[in-house]
Amino acid sequence: TSWATQIGYTQPQYSVSAIVNQKYNDWSDSYFSTSLGKERTYNDADSTNIGLRAWWRPQETGTATPSISVGFDTSETDATSNSNTTMYFVGLNWQDMFQADDRIGLAFGQPQKREGETTDPFAWEAYYQFQVNDSVSVTPAVFGGSDRNGTAGSDITGAVLETTFKF
């Protein structure tokens, strides 16, 4: 059994929202990003989960001021000690910096981490999207993370090139 309540307020230049979710007996979440998270699956405990989100964007694009997105989640369960989790993210996006419709973005954050973890997982990405013409955009990006899945030394880096066609 589960219920959720969400509230939000949005204006053209900003938005804030919050969600509260309560799960009761026999709930399960099959994915957690840290190794100790596996102990939280398939239990008969109750869980209270809170998510907070906000974004803001400048009135004019093409300036050094980015749009900003932030988020924070927390989850508390009465199943076991140290079973609470937290995560956060921050995203920055600059639009129209070099030419119309281009975007530069940075994002970083902590994947869901359980209390008592001895590692501090961290993830990041950076990209630049540019319009080749009205129908084609190209986005090179790099990304990385440290202590992936809560495992010390399990670091990753990579790159991707995305091409989008609009018809």
Question: Where do the protein language model's features map onto the residues?
Answer:
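Outer-membrane beta-barrel "beta-signal"
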Residues: D155-F167
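Transmembrane beta-barrel strands of outer-membrane/channel proteins
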Residues: A18-Q22, I68-T74, V90, I104-Q110, ...
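C-terminal hydrophobic structural anchor segments
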Residues: N93-S137
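Extended oligomerization regions of viral-like shell subunits
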Residues: P58, G71, N82-M97, R103-F108
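Gram-negative outer-membrane beta-barrel proteins
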Residues: Y24-S30, E60, T74-N82, F98-A100, ...
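Repeated loop/turn-to-beta-strand initiation elements of outer-membrane beta-barrel proteins
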Residues: W3-T5, Y9-A18, Y24-D29, Q59-I68, ...
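Membrane-embedded beta-strands of outer-membrane beta-barrel proteins
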Residues: T5-I7, L52-A54, V90-L92, A126, ...
